[in-house]
């Protein structure tokens, strides 16, 4: 069995209770790794969103991520030019000033026309798109309209990808134990066979306003990151598929891909580490999550 780095001690969430650990979990922070953050359902413009943004900026002091993936509902309510300022630019001002790039996907509350044309979302007018960083390729999808053209595109894009890591993200979760929405089964029927066929490693979604990590399904680890602004406290309904969850406070995630390992942490608005682990990409693109 692959040995964990001795400097890493993880915290895990069981029944929404934060379990104590001896030390604070750390990331390897290797110079040649891909480092990014994950946020979703954040664009409220309310104090909790600003506090999450502050925690992200603080985390970056020791974990210098250069990109943030956004899993939708990037802005709620009106989405005028001034709303992009109060619900995006101001909450993440230190990150934007440091040159951190944000890559958005569309949620059901997003104004697609406004989002697609907003330069700091880096969508370049495309509802779905992909981009690469070192050995990782990211695929952003529009789960609001999973039409045949988009399905054909993701099938082809995944088939043609030779990258070691394939990470997909979009708004509606294929798996979720959130009480408000739960899994998007019709979307899962369409996308999961494609993901399995072409070796997708990890999928990030939102929509349910909780943090959740699902036990690997057909070799894929699914995360719900829907509480970076909005929150439905106590909304998780744990099942046999639940690996970890946190629904007592807003949260965001930090991820580092280093070779065949993907280290991840979920952090709360208060700065607590509420989940963490390592996903190891093994032979034949099979993965193993520790723990």
Task: Please give the residue ranges for each predicted region.
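N-terminal active-site segment of His-dependent metallophosphoesterases
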Residues: 21-83, 144, 177
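Active-site glycine-centered loops adjacent to acidic/histidine catalytic or metal-binding residues
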Residues: 41, 72-73, 107-108, 171, ...
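Secondary-structure transition/turn motif
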Residues: 43, 141-144, 224, 265-272, ...
């Amino acid at each position: 069995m692959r040995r964990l780095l001795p400097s890493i001690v993880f915290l895990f969430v069981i029944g929404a209770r934060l379990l104590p650990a001896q030390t604070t979990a750390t990331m390897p922070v290797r110079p040649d790794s891909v480092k990014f953050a994950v946020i979703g359902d954040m664009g409220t413009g309310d104090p909790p969103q600003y506090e999450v943004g502050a925690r992200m900026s603080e985390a970056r002091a020791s974990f210098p991520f250069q990109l943030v993936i956004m899993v939708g509902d990037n802005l709620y309510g009106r989405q005028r030019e001034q709303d992009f300022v109060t619900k995006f630019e101001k909450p993440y001002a230190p990150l934007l000033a440091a040159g951190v790039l944000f890559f958005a996907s569309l949620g059901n509350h997003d104004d697609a026309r406004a989002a697609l044309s907003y330069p700091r979302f880096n969508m370049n007018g495309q509802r779905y798109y992909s981009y690469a960083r070192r050995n990782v390729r990211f695929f952003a999808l529009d789960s609001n309209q999973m039409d045949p053209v988009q399905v054909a595109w993701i099938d082809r894009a995944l088939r043609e990808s030779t990258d070691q890591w394939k990470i997909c993200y979009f708004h509606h979760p294929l798996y979720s134990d959130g009480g408000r929405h739960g899994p998007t089964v019709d979307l899962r029927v369409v996308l999961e066979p494609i993901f399995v066929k072409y070796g997708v490693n990890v999928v990030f979604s939102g929509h349910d306003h909780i943090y959740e990590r699902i036990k690997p399904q057909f070799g894929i680890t699914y995360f719900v990151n829907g509480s970076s602004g909005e929150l439905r406290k106590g909304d998780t309904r744990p099942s046999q598929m639940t690996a970890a969850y946190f629904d007592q406070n807003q949260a965001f995630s930090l991820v580092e891909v280093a070779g065949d390992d993907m280290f991840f942490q979920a952090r709360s608005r208060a700065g607590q580490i509420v989940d963490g682990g390592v996903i190891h990409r093994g032979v034949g693109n099979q993965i193993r999550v520790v723990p």
